[in-house]
């Protein structure tokens, strides 16, 4: 029987799968996310499609290293009024991102793709809308004093499941997608494959 391989180094994604009782192995892969994202933006791709494409690139890369198994890869895109955000390069970049998100509602798109035998066999995208309180520069800096560098690898420079929850007035949609993986959709597919108890 095929093993489930998570093509990610994300502790949050590993935790979601572990807490859901799944047996899997982690196989982190590296792709040039910035170049791929920028190319897709230039082509006019939607945030949803960009998340899906990045997840597929990761799955394809991992299947080269683990043929014959189910490869699960995921990616998350943050969009504010059509602008796509990347992970912050440094603390100053994080402060700028939080300032731009402050007082607005943005969307998170978390895509997952499963590859088997070098081709995609399933894909899904979860979405969430996050409304952020208006924050002063001093409030943003006080938040980053506590949260940085833990949030350096997170688009938007926050962890909504932790201290970052204080930044928001409202979160709607798929909570698991806020955490980086459309978990319920993934579990539905794996249940059909007999990899999850009924």
Swiss-Prot record:
GO cellular component terms, A-Z: cytoplasm
Similarity comment: Belongs to the Maf family.
Keywords: Cytoplasm, Hydrolase, Nucleotide metabolism
Annotated GO MF terms: nucleoside triphosphate diphosphatase activity
Name of this chain's protein: Nucleoside triphosphate pyrophosphatase 1
Catalytic center residues: 75 (proton acceptor)
Lyase in keyword set: no
Required cofactor names: a divalent metal cation
Pfam families: Maf
EC number: 3.6.1.9
Function: Nucleoside triphosphate pyrophosphatase. May have a dual role in cell division arrest and in preventing the incorporation of modified nucleotides into cellular nucleic acids.
Cellular localisation: Cytoplasm
Species classification: Bacteria, Pseudomonadati, Pseudomonadota, Alphaproteobacteria, Rhodobacterales
Reactions accelerated catalytically: a ribonucleoside 5'-triphosphate + H2O = a ribonucleoside 5'-phosphate + diphosphate + H(+); a 2'-deoxyribonucleoside 5'-triphosphate + H2O = a 2'-deoxyribonucleoside 5'-phosphate + diphosphate + H(+)
Predominant location: cytoplasm
Organism of derivation: Jannaschia sp. (strain CCS1)
GO terms for biological process, alphabetical: nucleotide metabolic process
